Each structure stands twice: as C-alpha cells, then as structure tokens.
C-alpha cells in the first residue's frame, strides 16, 4: 500500500483549476457568500482550498460539520441531496444571507446545492437539476470560447434526466447513454481514443477527496 502525500493534492488542485472557464466572472463576483459543509468528511480541506484558488474569498464552513467524524453525529443520513441533511448549512446561509450553499457527502463524490429564491427561501436542487445547469453553463462557455466544432460528445446513464439529451441536441453535441457506473462511461471514452472526438464532462478529474 502506498499512501499519497500532499504533493498529489497539489497535482489534483492544479488540474481542477485548469478547468476554469470564466476567471473574469469569478474576479467580478469573488466576494459572493458561499456556505459549505463537508458533512464530517473528506471534502473539508480540498473543497475550500479549491474555491480559494479559483478566487472566491467569502467561503464559510458549517463549523459543527467541519470536523471529520465517521459517525456523522449531526445528520441522520449524510446525503447532501436531502433537505434535512442540509438543514444546518441552510440555517447558516439564512443567518449570513449566503448566495450559494454547497455540501459534499463524506467521501466527497456527491454534492448538494441550494440557493435563495426571490423570497429569500433556500431551494435545494436535486442531482439532475444541478447537472443540467452545469452542463448548460459549460457548453455555453465552450461555444463562446470557440471550442465547439461538432467533434464533442457527452455521456449520460440510464438514470439521468433526458434533459441532458435536449441540452446536447441544442448545442449539436452527441450524447451517449450507458448503464450506471464509471466503468461503463470509461468504456465509451476508451472507444473514442485515437479519434478526433472530444469528451466533455467532469470525469477527467472526478475523485474522492
């Protein structure tokens, strides 16, 4: 067994930072209020550090949930897509009038997102809603930057919303569907190696923090 040291954290963070599509927007909105909860897990260091390196200067952690604890004492189930699980983060967000609430599950491979509506009530997005927003943003920026040339593709699983197909079709990006699991996604990516097709997605740097 080889234990990876902090230099691999640096490699990971640097690669993630290379994915930035709108540094000018971050600079303009650097002080937007973000509340983040790692749910007692692995995201406690890398997520705040990543946000800091992207340029966000006003990130507040939920203190009670910023302590690594495998018993997850402040939640019944550490699933950030459940409103009850996000309650402490949302309570803090209401207190500081946060613009965005983020939470990751203990191994930091799932994310919960909430934002205030016009009445100041925080709306929790589900995974499909978050995906469609991120996908639309990424493809919009790629189009603006001249990166879309008809040789890009995305991949969705059979449990993912069909809105992905609609967004891909709008941007004239091919959409593949596969069974649930990274191995099935990887198989499609592997099948395009050596071609001029380019995969668009987060899988390149997806990792448990």
What does each model-found stretch correspond to?
Residues 35, 99-103, 199-201:
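Short glycine-aspartate micro-motif
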Residues 205-209:
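Conserved small/polar residues in nucleotide/adenosyl-binding loops
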Residues 80-103, 153, 162, 177-187:
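Phosphate/diphosphate-binding loops
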Residues 45-50, 71-75, 111-117, 164-170, ...:
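Short acidic, glycine/serine/threonine-rich loops at helix termini
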Residues 38-44, 108-110, 160-162:
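Gly/Ser/Thr-rich loops at beta-strand to alpha-helix junctions
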């Amino acid at each position: 067994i080889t234990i990876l040291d902090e230099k691999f954290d640096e490699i990971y963070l640097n690669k993630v930072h290379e994915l930035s599509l709108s540094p000018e927007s971050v600079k303009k909105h650097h002080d937007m209020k973000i509340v983040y909860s790692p749910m007692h897990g692995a995201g406690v260091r890398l997520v705040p550090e990543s946000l800091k390196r992207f340029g966000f200067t006003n990130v507040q952690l939920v203190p009670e949930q910023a302590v690594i604890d495998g018993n997850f004492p402040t939640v019944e189930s550490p699933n950030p897509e459940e409103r009850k699980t996000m309650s402490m983060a949302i309570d803090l967000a209401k207190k500081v009038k946060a613009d965005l609430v983020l939470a990751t599950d203990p191994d930091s491979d799932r994310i919960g997102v909430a934002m205030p509506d016009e009445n100041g009530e925080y709306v929790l997005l589900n995974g499909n809603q978050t995906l469609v927003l991120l996908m639309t943003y990424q493809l919009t920026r790629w189009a603006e930057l001249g990166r879309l040339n008809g040789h890009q593709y995305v991949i969705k699983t059979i449990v993912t919303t069909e809105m992905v197909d609609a967004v891909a079709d709008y941007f004239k990006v091919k959409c593949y569907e596969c069974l649930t699991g990274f191995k099935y996604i990887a198989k499609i990516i592997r099948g395009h190696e050596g071609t001029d097709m380019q995969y668009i997605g987060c899988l390149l740097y997806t990792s448990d923090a």
